[in-house]
């Protein structure tokens, strides 16, 4: 919890408390913690918290008892058909000192190992068919770059069934006509080149986690964006995808390399 708070606060988010431990870490059953451990230096490099769908309880008001339920509304179809087989992810962080532009190689290493851990979870919990998480952008991130990224995500990863929607969608002031005219590549690959170039021209980069999710599955859904007023007013976009539809290269890299028997997960 302390490492999480330090990492998020350094980027402009966080709870404002000394330690980021909340009711979702302490409830019964609680969220579990996935960490990247550096055995040589004996430090935690990063982590996620997660909860499997079968452990999610539905509150009296119909909301699932998960961290995103104060920002997003979940359709009855989502709760019935998808949630029981979903792994909800949150609080993804990389340790301060491993997340700056100067530490780019270390950052990529930590993120890559986090993805290895997520891949392992899909093996340890074979009943899980979907991953649901969030990507975060901070108040200090340039608005123009933010709008380009959100436009791109909405264009290529829509949620036509409205499975999940933010209660109060982020007001972006987005110039949709200008962005329509900007993204004329005609394909994900070409429009991504435009996005990457334009964001860099504004003096920043596409956040690493956003990049990672965009490269996982062609059928990912983006559920819209809301302000998390309980976490430093960061802007969080819900994302969701089926494990079966992850690109084969990513499956081989992050799922196929995990041997549960070596670690004693299976008899």
Over which residues does each language-model region extend?
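Short amphipathic alpha-helix that is part of the acyltransferase structural core
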Residues: 1-52
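Short loop/turn segments at secondary-structure transitions that flank enzyme active sites
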Residues: 6, 40-42, 53-56, 95, ...
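Short secondary-structure junctions and interdomain/linker hinges
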Residues: 7-15, 160, 220-223, 246
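A short helix-loop-beta-strand connector motif used in the catalytic cores of GNAT acetyltransferases and
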Residues: 24-35, 58-59, 220-221, 231-237, ...
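Extracellular structured ligand-interaction cores
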Residues: 31, 45-47, 84-89, 128, ...
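Hydrophobic side chains in beta-strands
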Residues: 36-38, 50-52, 91, 133, ...
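Acyl-donor binding region in acyl/amide transferases
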Residues: 55-220, 224-228
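C-terminal non-catalytic accessory extensions
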Residues: 237-267
């Amino acid at each position: 919890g302390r490492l999480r708070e330090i990492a998020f606060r350094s980027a402009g988010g966080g709870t404002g408390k000394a330690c980021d431990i909340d009711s979702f870490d302490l409830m019964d059953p609680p969220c579990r913690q996935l960490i990247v451990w550096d055995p040589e230096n004996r430090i935690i490099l990063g982590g996620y918290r997660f909860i499997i769908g079968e452990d999610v309880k539905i509150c009296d008001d119909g909301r699932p008892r998960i961290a995103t339920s104060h920002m997003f509304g979940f359709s009855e179809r989502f709760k019935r058909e998808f949630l029981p087989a979903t792994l909800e992810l949150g609080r993804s962080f990389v340790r301060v000192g491993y997340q700056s532009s100067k530490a780019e190689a270390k950052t990529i290493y930590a993120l890559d190992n986090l993805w290895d851990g997520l891949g392992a979870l899909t093996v340890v919990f074979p009943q899980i068919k979907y991953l649901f998480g969030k990507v975060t952008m901070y108040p200090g991130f340039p608005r123009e770059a933010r709008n380009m990224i959100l436009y791109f995500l909405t264009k290529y990863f829509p949620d036509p069934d409205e499975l999940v929607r933010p209660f109060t969608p982020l007001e972006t002031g987005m110039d949709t006509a200008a962005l329509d005219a900007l993204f004329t590549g005609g394909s994900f690959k070409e429009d991504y080149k435009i996005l990457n170039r334009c964001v860099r021209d504004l003096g920043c980069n596409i956040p690493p986690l956003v990049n990672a999710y965009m490269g996982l599955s062609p059928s990912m859904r983006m559920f819209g964006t809301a302000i998390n007023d309980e976490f430093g007013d960061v802007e969080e976009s819900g994302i969701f995808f089926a494990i079966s539809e992850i690109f084969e290269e990513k499956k081989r890299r992050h799922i196929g390399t995990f041997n549960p028997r070596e670690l004693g997960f299976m008899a």
